[in-house]
């Protein structure tokens, strides 16, 4: 038995603003708890790090729930997943370069983590692509316009001019003007 959808339940209601604030607050809470986990780990408190990590995972889940309530992401999510797969794959090289920049700036302590994150981003791209393949959701872009976010590599398929002027990249939040037409 499938669960009744919560997608967009608060959209256009008096609860929309509250759900939006909760989504943002929970997302920031996840970030905070992960930062606390890193700090605790650096100080040898693995038990505290585990507690903070568990709290962060739950906060991230809560943020996703509120985002779904407001319909922040499309119900037909496969086009978004395709763009995410591209952005995640592009993120691998971007983070490798960032690790090099950290080393060049004498910030060696952070570089190994950035390299781990780079590999994880590449892995995310690969597993998302496997989902697209499994469910037959790859999009044939032949003859279609493809716009690429200059920040994260997210690909928008279609006519970006049809989107509102306040359109932002669903991955990194960059404005519409950050996209360029992929020739």
Language-model features, listed with the residues they occupy:
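Non-heme di-metal
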Residues: 1-183
């Amino acid at each position: 038995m499938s669960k009744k959808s919560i997608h967009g339940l608060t959209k256009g209601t008096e609860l929309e603003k509250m759900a939006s604030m909760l989504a943002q607050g929970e997302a920031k809470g996840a970030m905070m708890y992960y930062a606390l986990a890193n700090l605790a780990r650096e100080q040898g408190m693995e038990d505290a790090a585990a507690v903070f990590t568990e709290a962060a995972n739950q906060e991230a889940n809560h943020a996703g729930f509120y985002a779904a309530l407001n319909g922040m992401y499309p119900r037909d999510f496969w086009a978004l997943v395709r763009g995410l797969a591209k952005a995640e794959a592009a993120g691998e090289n971007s983070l490798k370069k960032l690790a090099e920049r950290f080393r060049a700036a004498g910030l060696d302590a952070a570089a190994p983590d950035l390299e781990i994150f780079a590999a994880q981003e590449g892995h995310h791209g690969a597993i998302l692509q496997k989902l697209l393949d499994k469910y037959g959701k790859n999009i044939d872009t032949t003859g279609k316009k493809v716009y690429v976010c200059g920040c994260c590599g997210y690909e928008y398929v279609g006519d970006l001019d049809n989107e509102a002027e306040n359109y932002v990249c669903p991955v990194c939040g960059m404005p519409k003007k950050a996209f360029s037409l992929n020739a």
